[in-house]
Amino acid sequence: MELKALDIINKFEALNKLADKETDLSTAIIIAKNLKELSTYKEIITKKRDIIIIKYAERNDDDVVVRDENGNVKITDVDGFNKDISEILDTIIEVNLLLLPKDKMMDMKISAKDILPLTDILDGEL
């Protein structure tokens, strides 16, 4: 399955929330395998994002990254930063994800926001 990097991040976060829910063994294994498959790509995406943040970070006279009052890194060239981040998040990556058995997850409590990134890997009618 081909996914954009942004979709990998969203699926990883949604699966991570599912991983805390109680389910049958086979579904738990599928969730765990999918998390493992996505985690490597998520780490690579995060490292590339961090490199871009450092590239565009504002620095003081001592070459220390400047942060705002909330602890966020101040960016010097917002347009360049957004362009580079968008390029990373739009990158297409081939991943091998297993389908989640919808019928085994019917008793799970999950928000629409959390299930949305997973709808294309649900096995069964919606």
For each of these PLM feature ranges, what is it?
Residues E2-A57:
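N-terminal interaction modules that seed assembly of large macromolecular complexes
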Residues E43-L126:
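Low-complexity intrinsically disordered segments
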